[in-house]
Amino acid sequence: MVNLTKLLITCVLSYCFLFADNNSPYVMVLGTAQDGGAPHAGCVKNCCSDKWGSSGKQFRVSCLGIVDPKTKEVWMIDATPDFPQQLNELTQNGKYKLRGIFLTHAHIGHYTGLIHLGREVMGAKEIPVYVMPRLKHFIESNGPWNQLISLKQIILNPLEDHGIVKLNDNLSVTPFTVPHRDEYSETGGFQVSGLTSKLMFIPDIDKWDKWEQNIREVIKDN
């Protein structure tokens, strides 16, 4: 099923970037569904039945793209099972350069798209992948993900809670943690900041009242 909370929060918090002028950084909402997309594998309920065989009714897994039209650079937040289509849309069929991928956590809808960077598919070279400490350890300790490291197809860049990452002169990203099922890694969200605007992207969280932040105040501040 589609996670309507993801859709609402993504759309509301993206407002300031989506209506930027042609030369300003902006974001692309590349997906809004939970880990398995919609329709889900094995789903025969009404929420899925009309989506099988109809690509126009299908929903891709939650993913956000960051675009700087001045530098022709793009970044992704999360590498989903829909990575091929989302990458192509974000880079405009290769016209823009993928400069990095930020991962939120180790649930299948948020990191398994990395497999397409391997030698069986893209054979990528040193794509920066930004990860929090537990997620970094998970990728380093488990195949096939650690093969991406050994073959230098990805370069892991460690993140710190609320540590600012400068992407270029126009953009920065700040990670933070949120409460969620953390079986294999912590769960993060990201604040994306431009020169005049910023937004916050939280694709997964258990409950807003479990977070030490007040979501209403966060929206006001972003």
What is the predicted function of each stretch?
Residues V2-T10:
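Sec-dependent signal peptide recognition
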Residues G31, V131-P133:
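Short beta-strand/turn micro-motifs composed of small residues
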Residues C11-A20:
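Hydrophobic h-region of N-terminal signal peptides that target proteins for export
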Residues D68-Y130:
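Active-site metal-binding motif and surrounding structural segment of the metallo-beta-lactamase
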Residues R134-G143:
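A short, active-site helix/loop in glycosyltransferases that binds the activated sugar's phosphate group
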